Amino acid sequence: MFYWILLALAIATEITGTLSMKWASVGNGNAGFILMLVMITLSYIFLSFAVKKIALGVAYALWEGIGILFITIFSVLLFDEALSTMKIAGLLTLVAGIVLIKSGTRKPGKPVKGAARATI
């Protein structure tokens, strides 16, 4: 459970960092760029700890996929960016992919004592 919390923190900091990049580009001052640097750095740190127990492919897909989903939603709400039918279809496809990746991931089972291993 702890590693999933780290992954959630990685996703949240990635979203914050990316949105602050946009905020900095439309505003004045360096605060947005500093916030971006800190948040994206934290995002990678959290992600690197999360992949200790979460499969890399799953963690990365969730990190990037959920990040893109929320960045798009917040970009529409905060920066008045357009959300076309094609973008909506892409986001729905992304969500379906995230669900399939997560549901297709098996937890490693306990090794059976005395189980034979196949040799080639």
From Swiss-Prot:
Lineage: Bacteria, Pseudomonadati, Pseudomonadota, Gammaproteobacteria, Enterobacterales
Family: Belongs to the drug/metabolite transporter (DMT) superfamily. Small multidrug resistance (SMR) (TC 2.A.7.1) family. MdtJ subfamily.
Subunit structure: Forms a complex with MdtI.
Signal peptide boundaries: none
TM region(s), chain numbering: 1-21, 31-51, 54-74, 81-101
SUPFAM superfamilies tied to this protein: Multidrug resistance efflux transporter EmrE (SSF103481)
Major place of residence: membrane
Function: Catalyzes the excretion of spermidine.
Single annotated GO MF: antiporter activity
Domain of life of the native organism: Bacteria
Name the UniProt record assigns to this protein: Spermidine export protein MdtJ
Any single GO BP term: glycine betaine transport
Pfam families for the chain: Multi_Drug_Res
Any one cellular-component term (Gene Ontology): plasma membrane
Gene name per UniProt: mdtJ
InterPro entries: Small_drug/metabolite_transptr, Small_multidrug_res, Spermidine_export_MdtJ
Membrane topology, from the record: Multi-pass membrane protein
